[in-house]
Amino acid sequence: MFLLRFTVMKSFRPKVVSSLGFKIRLFLAVFVLNFTVAKADDNHVFTDTIPIVERYGHILMPVTINHERKQLVFDTGAGGITLYGDKKPFKTKWISDWFDAKNHTKALEEGIMLVEFGSQCDSLPVSYAPLPSDSTLRAALLNIGDGLMGFCPLIRRGLNYFVKVDLRKGIMIVSNDHKWAKRTKGLRVSYKKCDVLPSFSIKVGKRHRTRTALDSGASHFCTIRTSVLDKWEKADKEFKACKAFDDSIEDNAGLFDTAIHKRRVKAYKCEFAIKSFKVGDAVIMDDPSGVTSVGEEIFHKAVIAFDPWHRKIIFQPYDK
């Protein structure tokens, strides 16, 4: 009986030791793997400095699409990446009522392309906007750049880029270093989600506040709905002290409009402020279409950093 018991215990002992050893080895392997991954994350920080090409006030960012170099307007008002030109044979196609509600004849071709920002490549959806070859709009748009690059592609990418635009130095810094934003001083402004323009509260004149969007593709400094400006002008004596004048501006009309047109606007020279970021004698224009936004001219006043990871925009005014 004793011999049988000893034999049974002896036969089971190696399995117990083997199981315990396996657990220890598994624990050590997981620990080493976690340490290696954490260390790899710290070491795989991507930062690239891209020279800015500025044309007609717009910021052009060099982007490689399917091994072709493109100069795309960095447009926070755009939802994705859009190229101007002829239609390309993509697998997917959709028609939007937004630009052709009557005839449904115009389509925006969309497909997956190899897109490179600096030295990082990804396959991203790219849209092709068909433009008539003889249109003045096509000629004007192609004179500015090859297309639009919105803020959303930077948000949707796995690297979650920070983008810092510095027109004074003529550079755009693109990075996935999450510590970088913490080291960047300035005003932080939140936005909600990718398909909504980054917005913030502004102050016009002495007392009027409104929420507006940052549209880096717009050529104006700031536009506010005509009805709002009329209300301020009638009800506020201090706002009347702002220098009002009529002006004619040249609009790059909507992407699918037929021509570029000039329109008369009512403009004001007022104090413009985003919290601590102030611009004296800024030109505030009315917009009959009801679009309220701050355009690309604000880039000439401050270094602006886009932080999609923390959903912030950082304004860093130039030292006077």
Q: Residue spans of the language-model regions?
A:
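Bacterial Sec-dependent N-terminal signal peptides
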Residues: 1-44
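Pepsin/retropepsin-fold aspartyl endopeptidases
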Residues: 40-320
